[in-house]
């Protein structure tokens, strides 16, 4: 950058450079007209002052049956994966992300000597995250604002009825409603004990099909084993009522 100074005193105080910098002084404008201007060039000054900018970006899941966090909050439903990034100036030699369960960071649970980290929060509670940067001799140190990550208590609710292929897009798939479920297994059976489907992702569901065809209306049964981010264990059993459709062109399985 170039800066014009009208009146130069004996001393000029400049802010410490954020990157290795060389200063060049040209003057004065009257001597320049006669071709007698003088130029003074400093040695390259190594950066000692530091600066950085940080961001935190959560990987959002578009699961309609998951109760997550608000758009402007971090955390919500576990597992929550968040990318913490720092953009640093040249003089930042020592870089560290800290994660703590203590708001005052009296105890630091995790340290990462990287500019960018991906961290997955899979236990219920509040976490505090900050970035610390310093120059080579630690004579200049700075900290970022603290990011708060709140992981909520677990929740698992199961519906007892749905109507596959009756009204596309509305109650046509059986899904649990959940929050902060970190382990999940679900089996669905017919009344004879035949397994209709098995899945291990709570965001998934059952479309009412068996071997590619819709099953007949009636009562089916689910068994669920799950674990929440708060350590709560779930063992659920119940019935699923498939409601009869008025459609006559259904491609159903026969018993």
What is each residue range found by the language model?
Residues 81-84, 147-255:
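Short loop/turn motifs at secondary-structure boundaries
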Residues 2-161, 179, 249:
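Short, compositionally biased serine/threonine- and acidic-rich segments at solvent-exposed termini, linkers
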């Amino acid at each position: 950058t170039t800066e014009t100074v009208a009146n130069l005193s004996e001393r000029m105080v400049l802010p410490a450079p954020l990157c290795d910098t060389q200063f060049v002084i040209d003057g004065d404008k009257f001597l320049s007209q006669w071709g007698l201007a003088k130029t003074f060039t400093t040695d390259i000054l190594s950066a000692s002052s530091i600066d950085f900018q940080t961001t935190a970006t959560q990987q959002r899941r578009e699961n309609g049956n998951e109760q997550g966090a608000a758009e402007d909050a971090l955390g919500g439903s576990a597992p929550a994966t968040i990318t913490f990034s720092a953009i640093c100036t040249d003089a930042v030699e020592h870089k560290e992300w800290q994660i703590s369960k203590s708001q005052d960071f009296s105890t630091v649970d995790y340290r990462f000597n990287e500019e960018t980290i991906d961290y997955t929060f899979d236990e219920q509670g509040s976490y505090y995250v900050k970035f610390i940067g310093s120059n080579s001799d630690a004579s200049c140190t700075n900290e970022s604002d603290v990011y708060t990550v709140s992981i909520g208590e677990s929740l698992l609710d199961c519906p007892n009825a749905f109507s596959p292929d009756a009204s596309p897009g509305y109650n046509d798939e059986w899904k649990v409603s959940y929050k902060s479920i970190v382990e999940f297994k679900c089996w669905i059976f017919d009344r004879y004990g035949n397994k209709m489907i098995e899945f291990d992702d709570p965001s998934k569901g059952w479309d009412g099909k068996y071997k590619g065809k819709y099953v007949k209306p009636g009562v089916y049964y689910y068994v669920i084993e799950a674990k929440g981010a708060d350590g709560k264990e779930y063992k659920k059993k119940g019935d699923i009522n498939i409601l009869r459709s008025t459609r006559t062109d259904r491609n159903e399985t026969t018993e």
